[in-house]
Amino acid sequence: MTQSLTITRPDDWHLHLRDGDMLRAVLPETARHFGRAIIMPNLVPPVVTGAEASAYRDRILAALPEGMTFEPLMTLYLTEDTDPADVAAAHASGLVKAVKLYPAGATTNSSSGVRDFDKVRPVLEKMAEIGLPLCTHGEVTDHDIDIFDREAVFIDRVLDPIRQSTPGLRVVMEHITTKDAADYVRSQDKDLGATITTHHLIINRNHILVGGIKPHYYCLPVAKREEHRLALRQAATSGDARFFLGTDSAPHTDANKLQTCGCAGCFTATNTMALLAHVFEEEGALDKLEGFASKNGPAFYRLPENDGQITLVKQDAPVAFPEQIDTPDGPVTVFDPSFAVHWTVT
């Protein structure tokens, strides 16, 4: 029996589009289903000023295929040299919707990130004053901290002190991967939200390591124990408006994934909405999918919801998604959930 679900056109509140040929190849995969996306600024070199964000936005719009509608929501990469006045001007112009905090060395192209948080305090204070959200890659990078503990330690050592010392600062904990993070969000009464990725609702660390290394499941923050995956599912499907979709879809060519020091990231733009329908159906929460994917994010960012709609249809036969996206730089493998998916977007 065919089953369908029509929802407000969703948004992606954490997306990597890269630049150049890669941008042109992967942008349609997002624009096909999503109305808007928060665009990550970790290019080489990173997007650190309003002028650079404006130029990057122009390149994204120029790469958008004719007939597609999509609005890139730009961010700035926070560095120890970021100018509070430039941040305020970029926000006032309507260009920049958030500033991204990368602890130095935490993930792809994060070497320009923050090491001394006292040096960015004036920027954070200005952001609190003007209501501009801070998006955080929530991991410490200390060599003595186990990679599976980086998120929990970040909350204690970095995030909570920042929030305590900067009242009114609106924060998005991006791509949370632990029960600790979900519980922290719930424990706060205002000014805090969190994005959850599609792949962290599906995989745990066993998917990466059991039966041989699976490079296409390797991402940062790395997937955790099963108890954490289940906690993320509960948060995403709960209807709590503080949790919303941020895919962290991150295209890397197979050549860069399948090597002795492979890149971190899962490319989920192609099949995210179908996978989410599968997950929410498993949890008996299809009625909560629209909130998670289409309503909670705009509410946090104080933006209107999208005007359009998409329809998800469940078919009797499994849906065959592309295994790869061809790019001039080489193929990019589409995330494979390792189970049959019967949902598709029509």
From Swiss-Prot:
Taxonomic path: Bacteria, Pseudomonadati, Pseudomonadota, Alphaproteobacteria, Rhodobacterales
Positions contributing to substrate binding: 16-18, 42, 137, 220, 252, 264
Name of the featured protein: Dihydroorotase
Positions with a binding annotation for Zn(2+) 1: 14, 16, 100, 248
Catalytic residues, chain numbering: 248
Co-factor remark: Binds 2 Zn(2+) ions per subunit.
Organism: Ruegeria sp. (strain TM1040) (Silicibacter sp.)
Family statement: Belongs to the metallo-dependent hydrolases superfamily. DHOase family. Class II DHOase subfamily.
PANTHER family per the UniProt record, alphabetical: DIHYDROOROTASE
Keywords attached to this entry: Hydrolase, Metal-binding, Pyrimidine biosynthesis, Zinc
Keyword Plastid: no
